[in-house]
Amino acid sequence: MGARTLIDKKEVVLEVKNLSIDIPVSQGVLHAVENINLHVGRGEILCVVGESGCGKSLTSLAIMGLLPKNAQRTAERLELNKKDLQELTERQLADIRGNRMAMIFQEPMTSLNPSFTIENQLLEPLLRHKELSKADARNQVIEMLELVGIKPAEPRLRQYPHQLSGGLRQRVMIAMSLLCNPDLIIADEPTTALDVTIQAQILELMMSLQEKFNTGILFITHDMGVVANIADRVAVMYAGQIVEEGPVSEIFNNPAHPYTRGLMGCIPVPGKVGQDNHLGTIPGMVPSVVNDFKSCRFGGRWDENYKENFKPCRLTEMPNSRRSYEVNLNEKHLVHFCCDECLHLSEHSLLEGSG
């Protein structure tokens, strides 16, 4: 697998503008996701990458309308095929889920119902969303299972999830997501629970099927190797905010935000990790985002090379915690900084060739 080439001017399937998610906790309000913007084009793979807990999965659940009841979602725009999902009733959303948009979850063993056979679970979306007889639906299920590499498919229909390997279960989930030919698939770390060999097979399968069906994919991961292999565009997420976005080649060759450069520095390079060359790390800890977070979210995590001559984020409080500075490096590469101190420091480090 290699990096994909971005095709311009794709029809936008998903558009998210100023999405925020707040969750009440015992200490106050957790601002889990704050004012993020993203879009996915038809036939495009957008990878959202970031550490565990940065809000990636919550973002996907918010799009699907599957957030827990205590989570509050607000968005200026949340559109699938130019239809605002926020205006739909729960019944209307149920008609869209599994039909026009589908989701592949991280762990197929807990996503598939252990009490029903594979056949019953795959027939359900077709019988619910398509006007098909059970016999025709069954034929489509068999065809799709064979398409995702489960051959022969018919004997598997009578099996239960626990009778399949992890790789086969994930292939079943991929088949289920594609049965109704959706416009958008959200894949939430679908290969994390698999070994590297099966992971490579699943990624290759998803890419080939995505091209065959011209489906837009929002792919959530923390693995930069996966991003390099499958992404058209990348959105880097940190502490509930998207800090950088752009074509995969731009993000890997010209990372601009200090967090993105830190992630790149953590990728092990064969032959360069030994007694004198340690694995790269990002200093400090991810901040708590409970209540009004008015200081720099990346403050205190800058590389020591920068901090020798500069003190990043001397601002301890900002007039508006949701203010940000956006820098267009080119028409497709956008970087977000939370304050002007970070902006100027990052510009200096880029000019010096650091990072």
Task: Locate predicted features.
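Conserved ABC transporter NBD signature motif
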Residues: 73-84, 355
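A short, proline-enriched helix->beta-strand linker immediately N-terminal to the Walker B motif
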Residues: 179-183
